[in-house]
């Protein structure tokens, strides 16, 4: 499915149809979108993705009943036309980086163009959804008298259910990550730093088309407890655990989020690590069959939360599971503080656990990715497990 095997025009058409239906379901005639994940979803991939995460240089106006309009930087319009058949216009930059003290003025000009498109369609008096943007954008739209509503829930719920083509991409991206992890294991030897090991894992992923990772979560030895410590200059020793979370956004912008813990070298890793690994691995694989369509998020949280061994609850991971798409996204399955909703076929979910005793010397992270179907969940991540710890 990677590369030329994906019909990006059809992919875009399927996603747009879902977004437009979501707008209709929420009685929202239009939304102006700046979040790169949402813009990509209703139009096409952009360039400079990581920069776009903090700099709003492209946006889209999507309508419930009309074709969307994409505003693209002039230098990128040619690339966008190869991916998107709809209307594309050059942007009026308004970021402070590009506009300086003219930022507010430029934002007013850009949003006046958006407002004109609402007006000609008879939508200027209705609500306009918005996901996120710089303050100057909100001020400009407020100055035009636009009634803004939060479009993030609308788009996140739409994105949570994947089309068949999206599911195929998720499967393929997971396979590529599995292959990257297998190749990475050939380089997991004592004497290398965490930085070197993370670089090797990313090298193996990027050679298969990965776009970026959401984190640098790789730790070793005592830095595996507590979790969430990113790669450092620590030199990995014989017998150390090495734990990582891929958080990899792969080809076509779809996330493969899996975690593994391995033993580096030949020395005995010790009972503390074995116990932690068995607990994390066992929790995840015993939980996966519970992820069936119709199960509410609350039911899953209340069912699975008590299954985590008491010895590891003080430092448990905040999520039991979460949705995957353009990033870690809706829904989140938690122990408490549940939100409404239920699993549906087409959701892509990562199920995870961290096990490390409070005050302990090591810990283990384990995570798998699954597809929710009309029957049993489909496991799509198959990176090797650490047999020496089972």
What spans do the regions from the language model cover?
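Active-site neighborhoods and metal-handling regions in enzymes and metal-associated proteins
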Residues: 1-390
């Amino acid at each position: 499915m990677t590369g030329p095997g994906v019909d990006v025009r059809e992919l875009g058409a399927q996603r747009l149809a879902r977004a437009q239906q979501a707008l209709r379901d929420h009685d929202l005639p239009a939304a102006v979108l700046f979040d790169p994940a949402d813009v990509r979803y209703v139009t096409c991939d952009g360039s400079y993705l990581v920069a776009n995460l903090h700099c709003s240089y492209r946006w889209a106006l999507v309508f419930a009943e009309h074709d969307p309009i994409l505003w693209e930087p002039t230098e990128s319009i040619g690339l966008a036309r190869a991916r998107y058949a709809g209307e594309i216009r050059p942007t009026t930059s308004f970021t402070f980086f590009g506009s300086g003290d003219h930022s507010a003025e430029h934002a007013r000009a850009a949003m006046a163009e958006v407002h004109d498109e609402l007006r000609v369609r008879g939508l200027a008096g209705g609500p306009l959804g918005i996901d996120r943007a710089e303050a100057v954008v909100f001020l400009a739209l407020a100055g035009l008298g636009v009634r803004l509503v939060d479009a993030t829930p609308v788009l996140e719920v739409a994105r949570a259910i994947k089309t068949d083509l999206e599911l195929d991409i998720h499967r393929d991206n997971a396979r590529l990550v599995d292959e990257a992890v297998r190749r990475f294991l050939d380089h997991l030897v004592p004497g290398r730093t965490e930085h070197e090991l993370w670089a090797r894992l990313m090298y193996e992923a990027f050679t298969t088309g990965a776009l970026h990772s959401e984190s640098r979560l790789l730790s070793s030895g005592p830095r595996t407890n507590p979790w969430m410590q990113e790669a450092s200059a620590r030199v990995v020793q014989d017998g150390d655990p090495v734990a990582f979370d891929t958080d990899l956004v792969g080809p076509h912008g779809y996330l493969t989020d899996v975690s593994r813990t391995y033993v580096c070298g030949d020395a005995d890793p010790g009972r503390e690590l074995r116990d932690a690994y068995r607990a994390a691995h066992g929790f995840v694989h015993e939980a996966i069959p519970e992820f069936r369509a119709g199960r509410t998020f609350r039911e899953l949280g209340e069912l699975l939360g008590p299954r985590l061994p008491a010895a590891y609850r003080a430092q448990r991971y905040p999520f039991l599971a979460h949705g995957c798409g353009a990033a870690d996204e809706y829904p989140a399955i938690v122990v408490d503080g549940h939100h409404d909703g239920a699993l549906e076929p087409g959701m892509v979910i990562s199920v995870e656990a961290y096990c490390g005793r409070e005050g302990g010397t090591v810990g283990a992270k384990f995570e798998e990715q699954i597809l929710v179907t009309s029957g049993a969940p489909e496991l799509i991540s198959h990176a090797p497990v650490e047999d020496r710890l089972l």
